[in-house]
């Protein structure tokens, strides 16, 4: 009943948006020389099927803001109402996708009202309802941590760039939602590394026995003629879905009052049922909900018991306060109770992050998660909704819980995270992954790490196995970009004056070898990429205290063979995504970046037309450019 009421609420909003266009243009009568009926008009929702895995933006109209269509008489209100309700009856999945992708409503709004695409967009984004009055603004209490962009570092003073791997993609999906809805994007909501890592790249598969491959490339920077870009790319081994270990999953679902929105709990339910479809008799599933208190809805049932899992998830209803800490404790207790040695033991938390009962401060929650992570149970955090999401809290929980953080803005994104990339989301192939790039002052005078601001580590923490890194899932990729300046570059670095010799500062190796790196030809190598990780298969049969496990060190010198006269398609795409991120942040480092130029360049790269996620990104950049 709750789902039906939310679906009807959605239908009313959808109806109001379509009718608003007719009201604004005064085309509200049923008369006229040309009649467009509801049956003759195809809305975006009708062309979105459950089998499609593309995001809503990919099927956005190809019309421009300047295009108009002949004025036609609007369909009668009752006919529109019947059509919209019919669309909803065809499936909540279709409704969710259509609503979240407001631009997809433009063709229908144009045909119903005979207005231009730009006018229809203004009507939708402003939510002007019949009568010409805009809808009352909703409170927005979304929380994002302050991000201070990484600046230029002088190699003479700081030759080491050290940071933890990050495979989260929440930031991109979240800002996509804002752009599609015509909302302003907060600068602190933009984490450029998560935007870059959302996309796949043509990195080679790792060699036999290796958890990941490493790709490096140096090419001219597209926004600064005085610098180059260094790409460091990791590609984890793609999973053989037929040989994956058994899973012990605990669905930890927020059913508090704040989840009582159609794009929160109902979307959570759809998402978890998608995941459950791929489980079998070797897997275990538990369901824990939390509101004012916590409830065990399902305990350790086999993945093959589809009917039982479906009934448990579909019967959930939202209401009450949010005692997330109680739910977290119970979820980990169940995960430990049904622990599968050598298997995938994971809590999957679905929430908007709005916690107001029990342990609520971020510091205490982080310590709680850190303690629970020692059990060998991993954590995936799925963020839902808008208006009150606590992005900072959800990211912190995932980072300290040996996990990953994704934002689910529609059912297509749920399908991408939980089915298409289930291996990466659910199965860890390398844990506590840390990267350290040591730059050669003979080749590089300064560098700037793009993104990863909240993953930067002290140089000495690289070799300290008690310091947490990031987790790399099966098939996941990590891409890091550095803007670098050669000694002869005009780029200002801000190198400090030094009174004493070169032996001070952090100019010592941190891999335990001691002393400076010995190289026969110091001009040949630009830098050395060092990576540390831990094998998740070790000590997986019991409590897994990361501080007691020794990491594995890999080193990859970067010499002139990595230098290219022009960017490869992979580097060009990653650089373009970074440029868009810098525009959204109004970065002081964006240089000559212009959206039109970025879009034009990216459209020429490989996979720009055959990769649905890249097509969607190009649509976003075009939409941003037209809104300027």
Show where each model-derived region lies.
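Sec-dependent N-terminal signal peptides
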Residues: 7-18, 29
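Long, acidic serine/threonine- and proline-rich intrinsically disordered regions
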Residues: 86, 93-99, 103-120, 125, ...
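Acidic/polar low-complexity segments with low predicted structural confidence
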Residues: 144-228
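N-terminal secretory signal peptides that target proteins for export/translocation
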Residues: 1-7
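Exposed acidic/Ser/Thr-rich ligand/metal-binding surfaces
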Residues: 28, 214-432, 491-517, 608, ...
